[in-house]
Amino acid sequence: MSSLYFDNYIKENKPQFKAKVDSISTMLSINPDWLLSVMLLESSINPQAVNKYTNAVGLIQFMPSTATELGTTTAELYEMNNLQQLDYVYKYLSRYAGKMNSLSDVYLSVFFPAAVNKANDYILQTSSLSAAKIASQNPAFDIDKDGKVTKAEIESFLQNWLKKKRLSFPHD
């Protein structure tokens, strides 16, 4: 069951949303807090969040090409509420079911799928996207400032980010 520290970030349909996140997480065999953490980092758990640079939309920042692969558009995703959009979150992440063994694997499924289940020294890059470009576009991930981002750096960033977030959550 998902943690209470995400409650303040879920703006609508809170009980139904949490129940659906729990259900999706069970189907994907992942911790629901991992999924909520990724949505919090990507969109502040806002289904109408839009990245002004990439036009990515929604809870996990669906790129236009990804939306098309999933049989929808970013415009349609933008019009959906949080419950409706979770169907597409599941549809997208189901591609990686059985491969997501950590928070970083869930995050990388969204941010850089080729890195899922790779060794910690795996450098994020492709034949058309250099390690240096990824590092320059995502400086928070290049922790050692060496012009490349490794899976270990993503893991470190996520753990530090999560610790900071937990410190800012209200305590019961």
Language model segments and positions:
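Low-complexity, Gly/Ser/Thr/Pro-rich intrinsically disordered linker/tail segments
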Residues: 154-172
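Catalytic glycan-binding domains that act on GlcNAc-containing polysaccharides
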Residues: 2-144, 151, 155
